[in-house]
């Protein structure tokens, strides 16, 4: 039996429970029908969320994938009830509470390059600032 070798590693953002075969998946070189079936099954409880996914494709068209947590910017927009952030970071377009920022940091801790909630909170606060979202006590 020939050894499987990795042919491609792709990072794509998909909507939970709504993955469809398309150009983004076609370029990875995997069985798109099988991937979308497995992805939609694993993400049925996260309908409508943007979910980053890392797909590892092998030379025999098989694959593995890892699901990450929703991006911080999406969580901040959801907490501030906004469609999008500011074009200029100096323009304030919304507010979130420090408690909401802590909840986002706690949720994202598993995927962030941080060891403590405080370090993750600093990352969340930096993202909010760049989006024009004010964090209030």
UniProtKB/Swiss-Prot annotation:
Biological classification of the source: Bacteria, Bacillati, Mycoplasmatota, Mycoplasmoidales, Mycoplasmoidaceae
Keyword RNA-binding annotated: yes
Molecular function terms from GO: large ribosomal subunit rRNA binding; structural constituent of ribosome
Species of origin: Mycoplasma genitalium (strain ATCC 33530 / DSM 19775 / NCTC 10195 / G37) (Mycoplasmoides genitalium)
Function per UniProt: Forms part of the ribosomal stalk which helps the ribosome interact with GTP-bound translation factors.
UniProt keyword annotations, A-Z: Methylation, Ribonucleoprotein, Ribosomal protein, RNA-binding, rRNA-binding
GO biological process: translation
Name the UniProt record assigns to this protein: Large ribosomal subunit protein uL11
NCBIfam families referenced in this protein's UniProt entry, alphabetically: L11_bact
Alphabetized InterPro entries for the sequence: Ribosomal_uL11, Ribosomal_uL11_bac-typ, Ribosomal_uL11_C, Ribosomal_uL11_C_sf, Ribosomal_uL11_CS, Ribosomal_uL11_N, Ribosomal_uL11_N_sf
């Amino acid at each position: 039996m020939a050894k499987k070798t990795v042919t491609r590693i792709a990072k794509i953002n998909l909507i939970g429970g709504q993955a469809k075969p398309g150009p983004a998946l076609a370029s990875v070189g995997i069985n798109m029908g099988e991937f979308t079936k497995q992805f939609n099954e694993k993400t049925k409880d996260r309908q409508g969320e943007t979910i980053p996914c890392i797909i590892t494709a092998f030379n025999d068209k098989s694959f593995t994938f890892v699901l990450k947590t929703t991006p911080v910017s999406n969580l901040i927009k959801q907490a501030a009830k906004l469609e999008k952030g500011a074009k200029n970071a100096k323009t304030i377009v919304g507010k979130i509470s420090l408690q909401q920022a802590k909840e986002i940091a706690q949720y994202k801790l598993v995927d962030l390059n941080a060891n403590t909630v405080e370090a993750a909170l600093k990352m969340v606060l930096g993202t909010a600032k760049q989006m024009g979202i004010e964090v209030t006590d």
